């Protein structure tokens, strides 16, 4: 039995980049021709010229908030705001809703969300039974996991959420080998089983998502005899990255291209620096190009010890949307980026807001190697020009600012 889901996982860098150079122009062209919204966004782009990650990074970023606005504007004529390249009917068996609401299409394709790869890495194998405890109501999480389980040859018990006693009875009767759902609900099941004296020790492995699973909780699961793995997936994009037995970050899925950009911009940051996760899908059905997730992450250096050769990320590290109201004016990360672009000598910057309610103090902290004379004054003028607010400028040596992805830090007292 193969240790890998397919041969794509162990490609050389050269093989992967060659495949990407062929896939990107085709995907851009498909998006332009079959997705009305992406066609408008990419109308001035020559698809044939987008053959690498470098060229991809020059395309505009579409953020989730924009997707929601376009969907609202297009309803009821177009539920998906012009982003889907598939229409209602046999090819779209379901439509799901996520908070917003944002509507997402289901597609009649094997393992549409590509979760099978994460299932395989978590040790799920053909012939096993998966206890699927994601909600089957309105949102796609349960169907994402179920389609992935089917892709690796598993059967699924559609448990959903709640009704803990009935779920424990079903586990005791059916003896599933695996669990999929949130980590918090798995803990509830295990604790309730202990209290009730119900044997559910058949569950030896789990694939969890939807919320954080810190090391302390993973250790607790291990002590209960359950080997838990995490995956990072969204309703819009499907599987983005997944955990392996190496337990070193998350390996990026083969069906997406991942970039880490400075929040509020489309500019890639150096490997290891925290920024916003931007994803391009290679799906012909829902072709999202440079989709800003609003989540923070960072590239993890090196390759996975398991032999999976794709890029790795550190996982979910918070939210990138740091828009803050200062003295009645909204200031967003893109404005800070605009200020930084005016000064080549500035390496990184962070806007820190302090003070108490109605007495906001704004300080722009910038890193510069050898700040020239007059830099503070010129940056101060740029701050006033861009934000229409006055603030203090503080110049720091390179490496002084924390590597946590924050561009705007709200340190005000709200007592």
Name each model-derived stretch.
Residues 213-304:
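Conserved AMP-binding/adenylate-forming
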Residues 176-185, 228, 249-257, 411-415:
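A polyampholytic, Gly/Pro-enriched intrinsically disordered region
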């Amino acid at each position: 039995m193969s240790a890998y889901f397919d041969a794509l996982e162990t490609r050389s860098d050269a093989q992967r980049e060659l495949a990407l150079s062929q896939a990107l122009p085709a995907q851009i062209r498909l998006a332009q021709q079959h997705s009305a919204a992406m066609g408008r966004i990419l109308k001035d782009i020559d698809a044939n010229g987008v053959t690498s990650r470098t060229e991809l990074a020059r395309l505009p970023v579409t953020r989730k908030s924009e997707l929601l606005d376009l969907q609202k504007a297009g309803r009821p004529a177009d539920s998906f705001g012009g982003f889907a390249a598939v229409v209602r009917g046999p090819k779209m068996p379901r439509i799901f809703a996520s908070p917003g609401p944002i509507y997402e299409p289901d597609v009649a394709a094997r393992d549409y969300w590509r979760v099978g790869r994460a299932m395989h890495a978590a040790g799920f194998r053909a012939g096993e039974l998966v206890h699927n405890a994601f909600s089957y109501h309105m949102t796609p999480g349960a169907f994402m996991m179920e389609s992935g389980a089917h892709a690796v040859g598993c059967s699924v018990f559609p448990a959903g959420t709640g009704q803990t006693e009935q779920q424990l009875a079903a586990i005791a009767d059916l003896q599933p080998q695996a669990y999929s759902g949130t980590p918090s609900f798995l803990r509830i099941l295990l604790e309730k089983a202990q209290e009730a004296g119900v044997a559910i020790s058949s569950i030896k492995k789990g694939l969890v998502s939807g919320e954080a699973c810190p090391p302390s909780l993973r250790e607790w699961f291990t002590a209960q005899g359950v080997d838990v793995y995490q995956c990072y997936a969204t309703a819009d994009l499907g599987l983005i990255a997944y955990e392996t037995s190496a337990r070193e970050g998350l390996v990026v899925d083969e069906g997406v291209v991942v970039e880490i950009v400075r929040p509020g911009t489309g500019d890639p940051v150096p490997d290891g620096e925290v920024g916003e996760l931007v994803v391009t899908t290679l799906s012909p059905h829902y072709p999202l190009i440079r989709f800003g997730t609003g989540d923070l992450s960072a590239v993890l250096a090196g390759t996975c010890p398991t032999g999976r050769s794709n890029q790795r990320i550190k996982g979910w590290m918070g939210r990138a949307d740091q828009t803050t109201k200062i003295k009645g004016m909204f200031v967003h990360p893109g404005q800070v980026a605009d200020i930084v672009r005016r000064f080549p000598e500035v390496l990184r910057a962070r806007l820190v807001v302090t003070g108490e309610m109605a007495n906001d103090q704004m300080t722009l902290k910038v890193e510069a190697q050898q700040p020239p004379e007059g830099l503070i004054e010129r940056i101060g003028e740029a701050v006033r020009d861009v934000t229409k607010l006055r603030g203090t400028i503080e110049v720091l040596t390179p490496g002084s600012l924390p590597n946590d992805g924050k561009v705007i830090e709200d340190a005000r007292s709200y007592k």
